Amino acid sequence: MQIHIVGAGPAGLLFALLIKRRFPAWRVHIFEQNPPDATFGFGVVFSLNALAFLERDVADFHALLIPRLESWPMQRIVHRDEQVEIDGNGFSAIGRLELNQFLQELCAAAGVEIEYHRVIASIDEVSDCDLLVGADGGNSFIRRALEAEFETELELLTNRFAWYGTRQTFECLSLTFRTNADGSFVAHHYRHSPSMSTFVVECDEVTWRHAGLDRMSEDGSRGYCERVFAPDLKGNPLLSNKSIWRQFPLVWTRRWSVRNVILIGDALRTVHFSIGSGTRLAFEDAIALDRAFAETGDDVARALDVFERERRPVVEKILAAANASSYWYERLPEKMKLQPCELAYDYMKRSGRMTDERLRELSPKFMARVDMERAAKTRGES
């Protein structure tokens, strides 16, 4: 059995590791266009305890990963210079490069072949195999090569965002809302190592154009964002790594496989960064695809059917929540008219899945503050 995987990110690496361990005689070859130490975006974030499933399926990777995570038990919203803490809404984070390097080492030890610096110009270059896995991210070459057959759908969100790093470390994952004469901004920021943080700046299109960010250089944009978030960066600069302004692409494929070609991770569907589930879903895809082959052996067609049957309901549920979250940010100027606690409450309800009852169980201190401020507002209006 010959397996070709395009893309050496979390999805491709973990699937390669699992399938090679399960079937050592199978040849598993990864094609990656970048060098092994390339990474973009600085850190990745997971909801707290979201990776417990790894302990069962790839215990050595789990053992390497968990002690290196930066973790915190709450989230913080900063609006109008007022902090609102949301207890119980914890997250963990790690640097993207560190995460990939762990997986690269495990893959090499298992006998997976990884070919770096390999730019693929035609799908024919990698199609001579029993199974071709497209794990090459949101701009997947494999998906685009078979776009009509995968029945790909694409929606570009209107907000702009740029992904930075900074040596300013933060206590927890935070959303910081700022305004200036040009409009409204929000930063998603969290530490992903003891000395580094990820800092994603987002704004609506009107603000982006009014600020002249559509015409600025990368350095000019970085300097502008440093000024907007100066109170939060405390003198530390933002660090660029291809930190250009982008629009988030909501990608979905109606078909998950075409003949012996399957997509996993962001190549299959993109998940907005505001819910912190993209890498977790990539891992879960890899595990589910490996399990499908455990059930079917080398029957590729049947394995792909089993994979889709197991994963599609789960993915569709999470994707609905992620899309609802992304649309919440698309109304950023409107949301910033809310008072700080009102904004935090509205944020927690943005996916449509969170009830007040569940929120009281998850975040009792936060909801006590919500109730107190509501009562004070009612007294003031009476």
Show where each model-derived region lies:
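Extreme N-terminal starter segment of soluble prokaryotic enzymes
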Residues: 1-3
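Conserved mid-domain beta->alpha element of the FAD-binding
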Residues: 5-21, 133-134, 244-328
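Conserved Rossmann-like nucleotide-cofactor binding loop
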Residues: 11, 15, 36, 139
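Glycine-rich FAD pyrophosphate-binding loop
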Residues: 18-41
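C-terminal helical "tail/cap" subdomain of flavin- and related membrane-associated enzymes
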Residues: 21, 291-382
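Conserved N-terminal glycine-rich FAD pyrophosphate-binding loop of Rossmann-like flavoproteins
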Residues: 35-53
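Conserved N-terminal helical subregion
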Residues: 48-163, 365-381
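Conserved FAD/dinucleotide-binding core of flavoprotein oxidoreductases
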Residues: 89, 95, 171-250
